[in-house]
Amino acid sequence: DITTTEIDDAFSVELLAENRVRVGVHIAAPALGIVRGDAVDAIARARLSTVYMPGDKITMLPTEVVAAFTLPEGGLRPALSLYIIVDRGTQEIVATETHAELVYVKSNLRHNTLDACVTEEALASGSGDYPHKDEIAILWPLAQALFEKRQAARAGYGLRREVPGNTDYNFYVEGEHVTITPRRRGSPLDLIVAELAILANSTWGAMLHDHGVPWIYRTQRTLAAAG
């Protein structure tokens, strides 16, 4: 939302011939500017993670480093990019490639301003007017296809289907005034961001596995209450 300072992912869309599209998943890469054992590395190792709290946070990296590597509108920043070639008729991925590169960020899209108009109904009918409407319309069916593919894989492992739609909350603190607004998890923009990030993680995880390189995933598992 509007309070986000660590903008760590961006997407690009390029139309190709034969009803194909090239989608880029660009992940901020501050590690490219950190040397093992240097001062920034020591701070990151001590903090381990960004700490979130209502209306505030303590970032894992110093503010100056965040500013240098976040992906702001109008900024040219280093990123690790996954490019996928997608058949738009089937939503199948026919090729992938990975690059460490500089990317120019044209726009920052905010959930708090777009979730209300980028709805399932608006995407189905083509209604509404919002930034990058055509690109979002291309990414939406891809995200749905990626989600369904993951659910089929979960079923193969005997796991239950994921049910998106939980409500999250944003906190805005201005002096002594606190505003709490609901945010629905599983909205189209939320699903697009989640599925493309998961795709990048799984693709790069498989690549590292193939080359015998260790890879650590962060998980957010909900534990059932004992009773």
Task: Describe the function of each predicted region.
Residues 1-227:
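Electropositive polyanion-binding surfaces
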